[in-house]
Regions:
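Glycine- and aromatic-enriched membrane insertion/assembly motifs of diderm outer-membrane
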Residues: 34-108, 157-160
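Residues on the lipid-exposed face of transmembrane beta-strands in outer-membrane beta-barrel proteins
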Residues: 45-49, 61-67, 99-103, 118-122, ...
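Cleavable N-terminal export/targeting peptides
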Residues: 1-38, 187
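Outer-membrane beta-barrel "beta-signal"
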Residues: 173-187
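Outer-membrane beta-barrel proteins
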Residues: 54-56, 85-90, 125-129, 171-175
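Extracellular loop and loop/strand-boundary signature of outer-membrane beta-barrel proteins
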Residues: 48-51, 85-89, 130-136, 165-167
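Mid-chain, well-packed structural core segment of small domains
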Residues: 112-130, 139-143
Length: 187
């Protein structure tokens, strides 16, 4: 898939996720006592497109934890993401373990909550080449990311989201457009 086609495809998915969130019925937000403080508040999954520097676009898969708020509207989200793509006979993959900090911008009376944030992650990048082309290599790199998105708390224990993220990783910068869900534990 070429770069223009992958960006158009990713934008179509993002618009679809936002449309789904805008048409879904929102449930009242959980009481603030349930959402305040740090702790294991929920678990979720994500899927989307990643466009790594110097390679074709591919599917990005991930899992995340809602670790709560350390101040009002500021969330901690530990996560793991993985993608793999073949480029010029070389398979490149990235397993990322990281944590994001997202700031919510609640809209009074609105069902959708925009957010922005950033984070740090360890990227375990691996390149596998055929035996005649040097074999392969692996490296661990520290990455910084920025992101923005929209989330919708559809039910007290289920929320959906769509986000755009850019990872700054040496030699493997990545644009990601993802969507997913978070199941919140109510206790």
């Amino acid at each position: 898939m070429n770069r223009n086609g992958s960006v158009v495809g990713a934008l179509i998915v993002a618009v679809g996720l936002v449309s789904l969130g805008a048409t879904a019925h929102a449930a009242p937000a959980p009481a603030s006592t349930n959402s305040q403080g740090l702790g294991f508040r929920g678990l979720g999954a994500r899927i989307g497109f990643v466009d790594p520097e110097g390679a074709s676009s591919t599917v990005d898969l991930g899992l995340h934890i809602d670790a709560g708020e350390f101040v009002q509207h500021v969330h901690i989200v530990p996560l793991v993401e993985y993608w793999k793509v073949g480029a010029s006979g070389v398979d490149v993959s990235d397993l990322m373990l990281g944590s994001d900090v997202n700031v919510d911008f609640p809209v009074e009376g609105g069902r959708l909550t925009p957010y922005a944030g950033g984070g740090l992650g360890l990227h375990f990048v691996k390149a596998d080449a055929p035996p005649g082309f040097g074999g392969g290599a692996s490296d661990t790199k520290l990455g910084l990311n920025i992101q923005g998105g929209i989330k919708n708390q559809m039910m007290p224990n289920l929320g959906i989201f769509g986000e755009v993220k850019y990872n700054f990783v040496s030699d493997v910068n990545q644009l990601k457009i993802t969507g997913g869900f978070t199941y919140n534990f109510i206790y």
